[in-house]
């Protein structure tokens, strides 16, 4: 019984490794990718470093421009 459980656990870990789990959004490894996505967004103003109005949630971590 225990050997069957061990084999099943091994197969599951091979099929679904723990590194395949996505990182949380606040992890430093994720932030450069989000900044790059912000800069590619059509409403992102690169000179001011913020999103123009209307500031969509898809603009990511960038702040909304005040005016």
Curated annotation (Swiss-Prot):
Gene Ontology terms: cellular component: extracellular region
Is Signal a UniProt keyword of this protein?
yes
Which parts of the chain span the membrane according to its record? none
Disulfide cysteine pairs (residue numbers): 50-59, 51-64, 55-65
- Summarize tissue expression: Expressed by the venom duct.
Query: Propeptide-annotated positions?
Result: 21-48
One example GO MF annotation: sodium channel regulator activity
Localization? Secreted
Point out the signal peptide segment.
1-20
Question: Pfam families this protein is in?
Answer: Conotoxin (PF02950)
User: Does Signal appear among the keywords?
Assistant: yes
Which UniProt key words apply to this protein? Cleavage on pair of basic residues, Disulfide bond, Ion channel impairing toxin, Neurotoxin, Secreted, Signal, Toxin, Voltage-gated sodium channel impairing toxin
Q: What else is known?
A: Negative results: has no effects (10 uM tested) on the human tetrodotoxin-sensitive Nav1.1/SCN1A, Nav1.2/SCN2A, Nav1.3/SCN3A, Nav1.4/SCN4A, Nav1.6/SCN8A and Nav1.7/SCN9A, as well as human tetrodotoxin-resistant Nav1.5/SCN7A.
Role: Mu-conotoxins block voltage-gated sodium channels (Nav). This toxin specifically inhibits mammalian Nav1.8/SCN10A sodium currents (IC(50)=2.11 uM) without inducing a shift in the current-voltage relationship of this channel. In vivo, shows potent analgesic activity in a mice hotplate analgesic assay. In addition, this toxin has better analgesic effects than Ziconotide, an analgesic drug.
Q: What does the sequence similarity comment in the record state about its family? A: Belongs to the conotoxin M superfamily.
- Entry text on domains: The cysteine framework is III (CC-C-C-CC).
Q: What is this protein called?
A: Mu-conotoxin TsIIIA
- Native organism is Conus tessulatus
Q: What is the lineage of its organism?
A: Eukaryota, Metazoa, Spiralia, Lophotrochozoa, Mollusca
């Amino acid at each position: 019984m225990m050997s069957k459980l061990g084999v099943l656990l091994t197969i599951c870990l091979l099929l679904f490794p723990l590194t395949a789990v996505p990182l949380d959004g606040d992890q430093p490894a994720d932030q450069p990718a989000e900044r790059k996505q912000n800069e590619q967004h059509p409403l992102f103003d690169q000179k001011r470093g913020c999103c123009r109005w209307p500031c969509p949630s898809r603009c990511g971590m960038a702040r909304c421009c005040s005016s």
